[in-house]
């Protein structure tokens, strides 16, 4: 298996480049034909199977790869794969998208801020709503519009968890459906299942509304891997909130913060360090 590193020799961190080369040289595999994630896993110093946060970015866009090189990043190309690996990768790299830079600065900043807000909403909206509806005084408070007014036989927590799994089921079914029917299948399947579940008192309309928002919001962020990381952490927050109430939500949030600050990128450094900056155009890139 062959790999190729592309970098700007005037901007790249030499120590970083040496680490990446050493990690690539240490990989002992006959072939990697299905995914670059196998290379990424082999390059990790510590394999944290319990940590869902992605530590590598992938792109198939030449402009995104070139912009990363200009910022001092390293691009790794692998045989049999159309995507390029971008190293190092920090958390805030997932907040921006290549298309943001094709808009005026004000619009691009607005889109990045909106993406951060969506990140937080998808993570906390269902656990916080669940805790609020468990409050018996909610119907008499200023937040009474959040209360569940329909009759239901399935506990709210079970409804939220069930809907999470149904959304993933529809995604998987759509992927395995011929492209001609995939969009229609997803839409009709969601409508039929949702209507039947409400009429059978399995789900309340409020649960469907919040989960529909979460499902749509997941497509507002550019990283598929980070979307599923937030999904798994949202499930952790739901379970901890159901078990310990607001204390469980606080403990779950603390766990997420600990995971973020202890995550180490493949090429070293800090995961939460923001590397977003504007660079001057580079003169050339060296290929080795």
What are these regions (language model features)?
Residues 26, 72, 108, 189, ...:
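Residue-identity detector for glycine
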Residues 39, 84, 185, 212, ...:
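Positions that flank functional sites
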Residues 90-237:
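Transmembrane alpha-helical segments that form the functional core of multipass membrane systems
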Residues 205-207, 211-279, 283-288:
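Hydrophobic alpha-helical transmembrane segments of membrane transport and translocation systems
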């Amino acid at each position: 298996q062959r790999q190729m590193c592309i970098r700007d020799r005037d901007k790249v961190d030499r120590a970083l480049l040496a680490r990446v080369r050493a990690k690539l040289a240490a990989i002992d595999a006959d072939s990697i034909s299905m995914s670059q994630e196998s290379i990424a896993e082999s390059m990790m110093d510590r394999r944290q199977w319990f940590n869902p946060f992605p530590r590598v970015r992938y792109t198939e866009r030449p402009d995104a790869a070139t912009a990363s090189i200009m910022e001092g990043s390293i691009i790794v190309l692998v045989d049999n794969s159309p995507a390029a690996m971008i190293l190092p990768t920090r958390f805030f790299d997932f907040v921006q998208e290549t298309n943001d830079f094709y808009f005026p600065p004000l619009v691009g900043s607005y889109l990045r801020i909106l993406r951060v807000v969506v990140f937080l909403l998808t993570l906390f909206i269902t656990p916080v709503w669940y805790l609020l509806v468990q409050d018996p005084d909610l119907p008499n408070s200023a937040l009474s519009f959040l209360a569940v007014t329909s009759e239901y036989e399935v506990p709210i927590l079970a409804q939220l968890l069930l809907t999470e799994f149904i959304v993933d089921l529809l995604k998987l079914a759509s992927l395995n459906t011929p492209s001609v029917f995939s969009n229609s299948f997803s839409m009709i399947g969601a409508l039929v299942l949702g209507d039947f579940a409400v009429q059978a008192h399995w789900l309340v309309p409020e649960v469907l509304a919040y989960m529909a928002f979460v499902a749509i919001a997941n497509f507002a962020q550019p990283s598929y891997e980070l979307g599923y990381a937030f999904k798994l952490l949202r499930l952790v927050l739901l379970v901890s909130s159901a078990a310990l109430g607001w204390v469980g939500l606080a403990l779950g949030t603390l766990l997420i913060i600990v995971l973020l600050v202890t995550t180490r990128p493949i090429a070293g450094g800090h995961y939460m360090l923001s590397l977003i900056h504007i660079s001057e155009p580079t003169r050339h890139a060296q290929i080795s």
